């Protein structure tokens, strides 16, 4: 069982002034931009720099949780300069835009994780239940260490 864990977070500033708010509609929901893309990319670069430094001799496997982390994982991969690999896992824990509390693996992990450094790449950690399940599942596959890299965290929702 893996005993090493770490967290890389893209921590975004909360006190940003927005001059123009873009809108996007997905299905029947309309969203307004709350964090400018340039700010997100700047913070992803900070995290990539840390991963480049901390993992330089590890050849980590980035395990991106689909669908949400796809763009974040792509941006992060472009900024990494160390040897690394990426793979994808798809879990279902939402019904529409609400977390169900139940996590179902839809697309599993095919890689051998024995003695590998694994970085789980997630877009949003809301309740933490998905991360808990992933760490438990990955830990049974004997990785050297497991780290979490999340774009956003909702601390008030963590369980």
Model region roles, listed by residue range:
Residues 4-159:
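PRPP-associated nucleotide enzymes
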């Amino acid at each position: 069982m893996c005993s090493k864990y770490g967290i890389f977070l893209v921590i975004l500033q909360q006190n940003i002034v927005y001059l123009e708010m873009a809108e996007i509609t997905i299905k029947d929901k309309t969203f307004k931009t709350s964090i400018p893309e340039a700010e997100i990319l700047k913070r992803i670069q900070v995290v990539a720099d840390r991963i480049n430094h901390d993992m330089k001799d590890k050849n980590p496997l980035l395990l991106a949780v689909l669908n949400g982390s796809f763009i974040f994982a792509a941006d992060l991969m472009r900024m990494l300069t160390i040897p690394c690999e990426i793979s994808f896992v798809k879990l279902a824990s939402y019904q529409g835009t609400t977390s169900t509390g139940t996590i179902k693996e839809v697309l599993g992990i095919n890689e051998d994780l024995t003695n590998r450094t694994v970085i789980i790449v997630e877009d949003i950690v809301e309740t933490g239940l998905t991360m808990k399940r992933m760490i438990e599942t990955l830990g049974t596959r004997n990785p050297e260490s497991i780290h979490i890299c999340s774009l956003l965290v909702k601390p008030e929702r963590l369980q």
